[in-house]
């Protein structure tokens, strides 16, 4: 992945050197930083973003966005990933209270854990994934929101899941 602060210069350099192909990253980015650092040269840039998009965001997620914006002055795609961490920890420990003081119990709980995802509309669940890629469930599940940067903002291309 590419750090949001580095993406504009990398995009700008590639475009100014004549590269016209696809540029993408597997990390969430900040449209404001791209606009300020690369401008129209960033058009067409694709990133796999944070954890939500307005189309699938629940009222709880919208409240988080509002509170985050008030506290930090702006909200961006990268910020979406921050909402989930504490919810996963708390819900996993509620599913198995022994996991509060026992890492082995926490890991065991990850294999079967599921809880309602309060940040998304519909019946999405909090769960751990990673079996296919890593042979064990050690990654928190968040929807993969694939975005394309165009004219100063991100447009969602599609939303996907991994196992």
What is each of the regions a protein language model found here?
Residues 5-8, 77-78, 132:
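Extracytoplasmic ligand-binding clamshell segments of periplasmic binding protein
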Residues 8, 12, 62, 66, ...:
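Solvent-exposed, polar/charged alpha-helical surfaces in well-ordered, non-transmembrane soluble domains
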Residues 1-17, 85, 89, 147:
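Hydrophobic alpha-helical
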Residues 13-84, 95-97, 157-162:
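Extracellular/periplasmic periplasmic-binding protein-like sensory domains
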Residues 1-3, 49-57, 103-107:
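Short, basic, helix/turn surface patches
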Residues 70-76, 91-154:
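Segments of small-molecule ligand-sensing domains
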């Amino acid at each position: 992945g590419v750090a949001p602060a580095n993406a504009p210069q990398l995009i700008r350099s590639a475009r100014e050197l004549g590269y016209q192909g696809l540029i993408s990253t597997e990390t969430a980015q900040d449209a404001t930083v791209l606009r300020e650092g690369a401008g129209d040269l960033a058009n067409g840039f694709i990133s796999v973003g944070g954890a939500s998009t307005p189309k699938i965001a629940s009222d709880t997620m919208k409240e988080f966005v509002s509170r985050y914006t008030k506290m930090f002055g702006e909200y961006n795609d990268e910020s979406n990933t921050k909402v989930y961490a504490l919810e996963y920890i708390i819900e996993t420990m509620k599913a198995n209270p022994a996991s509060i003081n026992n890492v082995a119990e926490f890991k065991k709980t990850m294999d079967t854990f599921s809880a309602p995802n309060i940040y998304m509309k519909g019946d999405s669940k909090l769960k751990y994934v990673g079996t296919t890629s890593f042979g064990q469930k050690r990654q928190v599940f968040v929807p993969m929101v694939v975005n394309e940067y165009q004219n100063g903002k991100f447009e969602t291309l599609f939303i996907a899941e991994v196992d």
